[in-house]
């Protein structure tokens, strides 16, 4: 009898019980803290990088926003970049920032930009674990209509001197509004291509 009980106990110890613990169910069912990391899929934005090597001063970033992400006409774009980008000698050429109608695969007409401002060391608030961000504000001469796809282009970027995983966030501001609306995040592996 004891042998049979011992066999049953050792079998259950080897096989184990396939019941999730309370901690496991909290991780998978919770909308709160994501221990693994990453941006929720509904906030992920598409992008394309060209000349994506370390220290390359001819890098080109195309960052797409689908029309269904923006439900009001937009007059200002706010792009935030973690300060690690500039700490590792990355530079964005402010004179080579463009905004186009359309998606990356089919760029349309360029949208005229009124002014581009750079503000470094801005507290991020939410959506990013870094406290220090660099902010680029793009003021448009004409509004981007609601539900219209557009692409932000950073041309002649000087990539950092090391590979970085960067969460580049986008907020938009409709004309006449005071509060910006978070649209999404481009999770970009910068200066990684060999």
Predicted regions and their residues:
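C-terminal segment of classical bacterial N-terminal signal peptides
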Residues: 11-20
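Bacterial N-terminal signal peptides that target proteins for export
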Residues: 1-7
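Generic structural detector for well-ordered beta-strands
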Residues: 64-66, 80, 137-139, 153, ...
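Low-complexity, intrinsically disordered segments enriched in Ser/Thr together with acidic residues
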Residues: 137-161
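Solvent-exposed residues in well-ordered beta-strands and their adjoining turns
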Residues: 66-68, 82, 141, 155-157, ...
